[in-house]
Amino acid sequence: MKGVLPVYKDSFFCGFNREDGLRLQMMYEPKLVYCHVNLDNRFEGYTDVLHGGLVFGILDVIVWYAIFMETKKIGMTRKTEMEFFKPVMSGSPYIAKGQFLRIEDRDIIATAWMEDHQGDVYAKVDALFREGKDLPVDHFINKFDFSRTDPEIKAYFLSLLE
């Protein structure tokens, strides 16, 4: 299974109908979630440098998808460790990537990073998620836009409703 992932309709990061959003298209291939990132200076923290909080937000979303695609668990961020190695520049192309690593008791552990097209890593987050409790799965799934999603991936998401 691989291809375009559905997006949470209201997401600032991924929602296609959000005029103010980033409209990132999340992609999946076995054991890896990724998206292409090239943002303008509306999102800078310093001149020509993307705000670190925005970089973190992108990587947090990548981690969520990486966990879901490998575990079918709807997780929530509990703890993170973020490192910035180089400034992430506005107007420059990057790829944000993430992978599920393992489950330890109730902790779901994953990582995500932002790299350039040569593979140099600019930022990385190690994350610990926990499965959400008492979430109405149907309400959650109904908030997704599957219009660009590959049929096999759509079926994977909708299988939560069975």
What kind of feature is each model-predicted range?
Residues M1-N41, N142-E162:
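Non-catalytic linker/capping segments at the edges of enzyme domains
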Residues M1-G3, M89-S90, L101-E162:
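HotDog/MaoC-like acyl-thioester-processing domains
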Residues M27-E29, Q99-I103:
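Short beta-strand micro-motifs enriched in acidic
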Residues H36-I58:
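A conserved, well-ordered hydrophobic junction motif at loop->secondary-structure transitions
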Residues V61-I95, L101, D126:
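Hydrophobic beta-strand-centered segment that forms part of the acyl-chain substrate-binding groove
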Residues D20-L22, K31-C35, G52, M76-T80, ...:
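A generic structural signal for short beta-strands and their flanking turns/coil linkers
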